[in-house]
Amino acid sequence: MLKSFVILFAFLASASATASHYYVTNNNTGLTCIILDGDFQFNLVFNEKNTTEKFTVTFNETVSVEGDCNGVRNNQSVQTLNIKFNPEGQSARYAKEWELDIVFGSSSNVAFEIIDYTLTTQRTDLVPYFGKFVRDANAAGDVTATQTNAYKCSTAKLGLVGGSTIDIKTSNVIAFAQMNGTVFPTDQVYEVCYLDARTNEVVPIVVGACLAALVVVVLVGYLIGRARAKRQGYASV
């Protein structure tokens, strides 16, 4: 279904990627609606012949990027990003590309959020299985932002049914935007993911506790030194 939307509206949007930089531009307005910066890592779980095997796969090279700034799904406005790529470990023996679809939605509460995603894999020299992985509706996800803000996270996790996950490392994401350029402006405001926000809160506390402990150690050492000096003074008298 998603693929049909992309094909239907392909003439309305253009998309591109350079290394780990992906964007979708509305050809009617010339404005960019989606920007995604980040490195993808796929943690895949296959249950084959009563055994469970796990594989970690990364990008090798991007084949093509498509997108849509004016999509509709279930009577809801959506924006889509479709990435076809060659994974690490691919060879001429297994030359089929992999495909990642990401769907963004918007509501009265948020400017954008990821509402759906699918990953279609093929056999490679490193992964002897293939399959289609879909979003786990029960998986926690916080790739969202309000107003004109973007999303930032050291590692954004997208859960898939069966225990697989998609990691987007060093991720900066925005959708439903109307940006003149295809990169984030220097004054872009970001909303930090929950995990990073907690880390930012914990680090000052830990540093403060370490400094307090260091002060106590120095003070105790000073007092012990003074006490020894006094005892030596009494002994000499």
From Swiss-Prot:
Signal peptide: 1-17
Extracellular topological segments: 18-204
Cytoplasmic side stretches: 226-237
GO process terms (BP): establishment of protein localization to organelle
Transmembrane domains' residue ranges: 205-225
Subcellular location: Membrane
Matching Pfam families: Lamp2_2nd (PF21222)
Disulfide bonding pattern of the chain: none
Membrane topology field: Single-pass type I membrane protein
Cellular compartments per GO CC: gut granule membrane; late endosome membrane; lysosomal membrane; phagocytic vesicle; plasma membrane
Residues bearing carbohydrate: N27, N50, N60, N75, N180
InterPro entries: Lamp2-like_TM, Lysosome-assoc_membr_glycop
Keywords recorded for this protein, A-Z: Glycoprotein, Membrane, Signal, Transmembrane, Transmembrane helix
Family: Belongs to the LAMP family.
Name under which the protein is recorded: LAMP family protein lmp-1
Organism: Caenorhabditis elegans
Lineage, opening ranks: Eukaryota, Metazoa, Ecdysozoa, Nematoda, Chromadorea
